[in-house]
Amino acid sequence: MANIKSAKKRILIAERNRLQNKAYKSAIKTFTKRFQAAVDDYKSNPSDDQLAAIQNEMSVTYSKIDKAVKVGVFHRNTGARKKAGLARILKAAT
């Protein structure tokens, strides 16, 4: 354990940031799974409504990834790679 006041503060800040980063990453994983489920539903029974649902899920997931990159949870290349993976899944389904 640190003895210096500023080091103690940094420990608290690092823990706070770790929990915030974990929440961002968890949310992105959840939205990615929802997107994948929407794509699977579309594959089994294609319709315009399900395609709209896929687009909506993709938009929400993209926005979460962009926000995570903006606040520094992900590097911009990691965010781009995750978004490209989603686009690849969508292209394979349609």
Swiss-Prot record:
Domain of life: Bacteria
GO molecular function, one term: small ribosomal subunit rRNA binding
A cellular-component GO term for this protein: small ribosomal subunit
Pfam families listed in its UniProt record: Ribosomal_S20p
Disulfide bonds: none
Keywords: Ribonucleoprotein, Ribosomal protein, RNA-binding, rRNA-binding
Keyword RNA-binding: yes
Keyword Nuclease: no
GO BP of this protein: translation
SUPFAM superfamilies the record matches: Ribosomal protein S20
Function: Binds directly to 16S ribosomal RNA.
Similarity comment text for this entry: Belongs to the bacterial ribosomal protein bS20 family.
Database matches in PANTHER family: 30S RIBOSOMAL PROTEIN S20, SMALL RIBOSOMAL SUBUNIT PROTEIN BS20C
Name of the protein in its database record: Small ribosomal subunit protein bS20
